[in-house]
Design a protein with these regions (language model features):
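Charged, alpha-helix-forming regions
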Residues: 1-89, 99, 109, 120, ...
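Surface-exposed helix/loop patches within compact recognition domains
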Residues: 94-97
Length: 173
């Protein structure tokens, strides 16, 4: 649970089970975000200068959710948008996850976060929820329990991440 403190900092308190769960989830997220060698870079000069990324949306629905098309009605514009933005966006997501992992690796029962670290946590938790929601086929908050074949442990984790994100938003505001 996140709580605000005087001076703009926040505290995070977790029990051992929460700590273990979050460490595992952030490790999986880091693995998901590892950038594969892209064969889809359209501009050879951009590839040589490491200036551009893939022009194709990922076949993995979770990655497609994290890196959606910029223009749903213009395939060419969407490819250009992806080529020039995905690498930077991916780096930001990796950095946010790394901040959360660092917080957990230095765990002593309670942690104090700066505003910048809290923003990284917010990004990382949001991305975890997007990935898990995609894997569980949750399309909006109203249908969380609509699929009788849903993984109930996955739903519990999704709800926990939602709660944790909510406490962080409350602490930030």
């Amino acid at each position: 649970m996140f709580k605000s403190r005087i001076g703009g900092k926040l505290t995070l308190q977790l029990d051992d089970a929460e700590l273990g769960l979050l460490a595992q989830l952030f490790e999986q997220m880091a693995e998901l975000l590892e950038h594969p060698e892209s064969e889809n870079v359209a501009d050879p000069l951009a590839k040589m200068l490491n200036m551009g990324g893939s022009t194709q949306i990922s076949e993995d629905p979770a990655l497609a959710r994290l890196f959606p098309d910029g223009y749903s009605d213009d395939e060419h514009a969407s490819a250009d948008f992806r080529r020039f933005t995905e690498e930077d966006l991916r780096a930001q997501k990796v950095a946010a996850v790394a901040t959360a992992q660092e917080t957990l690796s230095e765990w002593t029962g309670k942690s104090t976060l700066t505003q910048e670290q809290a923003q990284d946590w917010l990004r990382a938790l949001n991305d975890l929820r997007l990935v898990l929601g995609t894997r569980l086929e949750i399309t909006d908050s109203g249908d969380r329990y609509a699929n009788p074949n849903s993984d109930t442990s996955g739903l519990y984790i999704y709800n926990y991440l939602t709660y944790l994100q909510g406490t962080l938003i409350d602490a930030l505001t």
